Design a protein with these regions (language model features):
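Two-component/phosphorelay signaling modules centered on CheY-like receiver
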Residues: 15-34
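Acidic, metal-coordinating helix/loop segments flanking the phosphotransfer/catalytic sites
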Residues: 35-53
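Conserved phosphotransfer cores of two-component systems
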Residues: 47-49, 72-78, 99
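Conserved phosphotransfer microenvironments
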Residues: 55-70
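Short, flexible helix-to-coil linker/hinge segments that flank and couple to helix-turn-helix
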Residues: 94-97, 108-138
Length: 138
């Protein structure tokens, strides 16, 4: 029996980074169906591939990634959007979730990416702990 794979699309600013993410998923049940360099291309490709998950490395343009997340959330509500960032900042995480993201992962702190993505596809909202706001003191 052939294992079921889940289609994933990646947006990133460099071929090298996208290749590294693709290689991370080789021995998993994720199948990278497309890698693109900007949000507009991601939205267009999503119409064709209907991905289960879109992984956004937003380093070059946070605004572009937010716009893509909003469009994917509206046009493809079953696609889970995950931001994959070098920015360990609650402001970025909050903006990502407001734009429809299901996850916000910090690259330097993500040791088991495929496990986290699987949890997100099961409906969990995952946000790197360091990006959580500090509780206010009463």
């Amino acid at each position: 029996m052939t294992p079921i794979t889940r289609p994933v699309m990646i947006i990133g600013d460099s071929s090298r980074a996208m290749l590294a993410l693709t290689e991370t998923m080789v021995d998993s049940d994720f199948d990278v169906v497309a890698s693109v360099m900007d949000g507009e291309s991601l939205v267009l490709a999503a119409q064709h591939y209907q991905p289960a998950l879109a992984l956004l490395d937003f380093t070059p343009s946070f605004g572009d990634a937010l716009a893509a997340s909003r469009q994917l959330s509206q046009n493809h509500p079953t696609t889970k959007v995950v931001f994959f960032s070098t920015h360990d900042d609650a402001t970025y995480a909050a903006a990502a979730f407001e734009a429809g993201a299901a996850g916000f992962l910090v690259k330097q702190r993500t040791s088991d990416l495929t496990s986290l993505l699987t949890r997100i596809l099961r409906g969990e909202r995952i946000q790197h702990p360091a990006t959580l706001p500090t509780p206010s003191r009463q």
